[in-house]
Swiss-Prot record:
Superkingdom, natural source: Bacteria
InterPro entries, per the entry: Ribosomal_uS10, Ribosomal_uS10_CS, Ribosomal_uS10_dom, Ribosomal_uS10_dom_sf
Record function comment: Involved in the binding of tRNA to the ribosomes.
PROSITE patterns linked: RIBOSOMAL_S10 (PS00361)
Protein's UniProt name: Small ribosomal subunit protein uS10
Keywords: Ribonucleoprotein, Ribosomal protein
Gene3D superfamilies attached to this UniProt entry: Ribosomal protein S10 domain
The species this protein was found in: Streptococcus mutans serotype c (strain ATCC 700610 / UA159)
Assembly mode: Part of the 30S ribosomal subunit.
Any one Gene Ontology BP term: translation
Gene Ontology annotations for the cellular component aspect, listed alphabetically: ribonucleoprotein complex; ribosome
GO MF, any single term: structural constituent of ribosome
Family: Belongs to the universal ribosomal protein uS10 family.
Keyword match rRNA-binding: no
Length: 102
Protein backbone atom coordinates (compact mmCIF):
# COMPACT_ATOMS: atom_id res chain seq x y z
CA UNK A 1 0.00 0.00 0.00
CA UNK A 2 2.79 2.41 -0.88
CA UNK A 3 1.98 6.12 -1.43
CA UNK A 4 -1.58 5.66 -0.22
CA UNK A 5 -3.53 7.73 2.26
CA UNK A 6 -6.36 6.74 4.56
CA UNK A 7 -8.65 9.60 5.59
CA UNK A 8 -10.74 8.99 8.71
CA UNK A 9 -13.59 11.34 9.68
CA UNK A 10 -15.00 11.03 13.17
CA UNK A 11 -18.32 12.50 14.35
CA UNK A 12 -19.85 12.47 17.83
CA UNK A 13 -22.14 14.49 20.06
CA UNK A 14 -19.70 14.40 23.00
CA UNK A 15 -16.24 15.81 22.41
CA UNK A 16 -14.60 13.72 25.15
CA UNK A 17 -15.54 10.39 23.55
CA UNK A 18 -14.51 11.78 20.17
CA UNK A 19 -11.07 12.74 21.49
CA UNK A 20 -10.53 9.33 23.11
CA UNK A 21 -11.46 7.59 19.84
CA UNK A 22 -9.08 9.84 17.89
CA UNK A 23 -6.33 9.19 20.43
CA UNK A 24 -6.79 5.40 20.07
CA UNK A 25 -6.63 5.62 16.27
CA UNK A 26 -3.48 7.78 16.28
CA UNK A 27 -1.77 5.55 18.85
CA UNK A 28 -2.60 2.39 16.87
CA UNK A 29 -1.39 3.86 13.58
CA UNK A 30 1.91 5.14 15.00
CA UNK A 31 2.51 1.85 16.81
CA UNK A 32 2.26 -0.09 13.53
CA UNK A 33 4.66 2.19 11.67
CA UNK A 34 2.46 4.60 9.70
CA UNK A 35 2.81 8.37 9.82
CA UNK A 36 -0.24 10.27 11.07
CA UNK A 37 -1.48 13.81 10.42
CA UNK A 38 -4.08 14.98 12.89
CA UNK A 39 -6.47 14.83 14.59
CA UNK A 40 -7.63 18.06 12.96
CA UNK A 41 -10.70 19.62 14.62
CA UNK A 42 -13.34 20.48 12.03
CA UNK A 43 -16.12 23.06 12.58
CA UNK A 44 -18.83 21.98 15.01
CA UNK A 45 -22.34 21.68 13.57
CA UNK A 46 -24.94 23.29 15.81
CA UNK A 47 -28.63 22.41 15.43
CA UNK A 48 -31.08 24.56 17.37
CA UNK A 49 -34.67 23.41 17.97
CA UNK A 50 -37.34 25.74 19.38
CA UNK A 51 -40.38 24.11 21.01
CA UNK A 52 -43.51 25.63 22.56
CA UNK A 53 -43.56 24.64 26.26
CA UNK A 54 -47.35 24.54 26.66
CA UNK A 55 -49.53 22.06 24.81
CA UNK A 56 -52.26 24.33 23.38
CA UNK A 57 -51.61 28.02 24.01
CA UNK A 58 -49.02 30.40 25.50
CA UNK A 59 -47.00 30.76 22.34
CA UNK A 60 -44.68 33.28 24.03
CA UNK A 61 -43.34 30.60 26.36
CA UNK A 62 -40.80 28.64 24.36
CA UNK A 63 -37.85 26.41 25.09
CA UNK A 64 -34.76 25.96 22.96
CA UNK A 65 -32.72 22.79 22.62
CA UNK A 66 -29.29 22.58 21.05
CA UNK A 67 -27.50 19.62 19.53
CA UNK A 68 -23.81 19.93 18.68
CA UNK A 69 -21.96 17.55 16.37
CA UNK A 70 -18.21 17.60 16.91
CA UNK A 71 -15.93 16.39 14.11
CA UNK A 72 -12.27 15.36 13.74
CA UNK A 73 -10.18 14.44 10.71
CA UNK A 74 -7.21 12.05 10.77
CA UNK A 75 -4.95 11.28 7.79
CA UNK A 76 -2.81 8.15 7.85
CA UNK A 77 -0.04 8.40 5.26
CA UNK A 78 1.71 5.30 3.88
CA UNK A 79 -0.20 2.69 5.90
CA UNK A 80 1.09 -0.86 6.01
CA UNK A 81 -1.05 -3.97 5.92
CA UNK A 82 -0.38 -4.32 9.64
CA UNK A 83 -1.84 -0.82 10.18
CA UNK A 84 -5.02 -1.65 8.28
CA UNK A 85 -5.51 -4.91 10.21
CA UNK A 86 -4.97 -3.15 13.55
CA UNK A 87 -7.46 -0.41 12.64
CA UNK A 88 -10.08 -2.98 11.62
CA UNK A 89 -9.76 -4.74 14.99
CA UNK A 90 -9.78 -1.50 17.00
CA UNK A 91 -12.59 -1.17 19.55
CA UNK A 92 -13.86 2.43 19.63
CA UNK A 93 -16.30 3.96 22.14
CA UNK A 94 -19.97 3.84 21.25
CA UNK A 95 -21.48 7.07 19.99
CA UNK A 96 -18.65 7.79 17.54
CA UNK A 97 -19.44 7.67 13.82
CA UNK A 98 -16.43 6.65 11.69
CA UNK A 99 -16.11 7.30 7.95
CA UNK A 100 -13.05 5.86 6.20
CA UNK A 101 -11.90 6.84 2.71
CA UNK A 102 -8.98 5.19 0.96
Amino acid sequence: MANKKIRIRLKAYEHRTLDTAAEKIVETATRTGASVAGPVPLPTERSLYTVIRATHKYKDSREQFEMRTHKRLIDIVNPTQKTVDALMKLDLPSGVNVEIKL
